[in-house]
Amino acid sequence: MPAIDLSTIDLRAIKPSDLDWRKFTLDTGHPMRRIFIWSVAVNMGIGQSGERLEKAAKVMSELTGRTPSYRLAHKSIKDFGIRRGEPIGLLVTLRRNEAVWFLLRALAAVDFTLREESFNAGNVSFGIREHILVPGSRYDPALGIFGFDVAVTLARPGFRVQYRRRARADVGKDHRVSREETIRFFQDVLGVRILKR
């Protein structure tokens, strides 16, 4: 049973403040073992800087409600006209209510269907070919159409120990989120259909 009844929600009009990210958890019987959405990273690889990148940045900020971070080329590729250090991509990381809000809309764009190969231990990634498929987005002929990738990371309480600055530590093997638990989270909490190989 999904955390919310998606048939009662208009994904075009929903706002992050309408959601509570704490409700989107998979209860595994112990409070420290529950699984929740840690982050949703939205990536656009444009492959060039200039006007097209600026248009993509405008589209991404409309989609996510956040200002994107510019990602730089790691090396020069003469054939593609890319120089090292040149901005060629965009990234936005969403957390909590905003992460759930965007993820529901992104999943609606792919019909709440994901391939089994998209999952690994605690993560799932999928792509959307055209941003206009996302509910609530609109087509602007001056900007064009862009595709993007969505990467979702799941976590349990206590995962902060691997990211904090002081007394950093690894998360134990038994406490990590497995691939099977990741698939179960998306099926049970978000109502996603999994396409088998």
Swiss-Prot record:
SUPFAM superfamilies: RL5-like. InterPro entries: Ribosomal_uL5, Ribosomal_uL5_arc, Ribosomal_uL5_C, Ribosomal_uL5_dom_sf, Ribosomal_uL5_N. GO terms for biological process: translation. Keywords: Ribonucleoprotein, Ribosomal protein, RNA-binding, rRNA-binding, tRNA-binding. It comes from the Archaea. One of its GO terms (molecular function) is structural constituent of ribosome. GO terms for cellular component: ribonucleoprotein complex; ribosome. The keyword Ribonucleoprotein applies. This is one of the proteins that bind and probably mediate the attachment of the 5S RNA into the large ribosomal subunit, where it forms part of the central protuberance. In the 70S ribosome it contacts protein S13 of the 30S subunit (bridge B1b), connecting the 2 subunits; this bridge is implicated in subunit movement. May contact the P site tRNA; the 5S rRNA and some of its associated proteins might help stabilize positioning of ribosome-bound tRNAs. Belongs to the universal ribosomal protein uL5 family. Part of the 50S ribosomal subunit; contacts the 5S rRNA and probably tRNA. Forms a bridge to the 30S subunit in the 70S ribosome. This is Large ribosomal subunit protein uL5. It comes from Caldivirga maquilingensis (strain ATCC 700844 / DSM 13496 / JCM 10307 / IC-167). The lineage of its organism: Archaea, Thermoproteota, Thermoprotei, Thermoproteales, Thermoproteaceae.
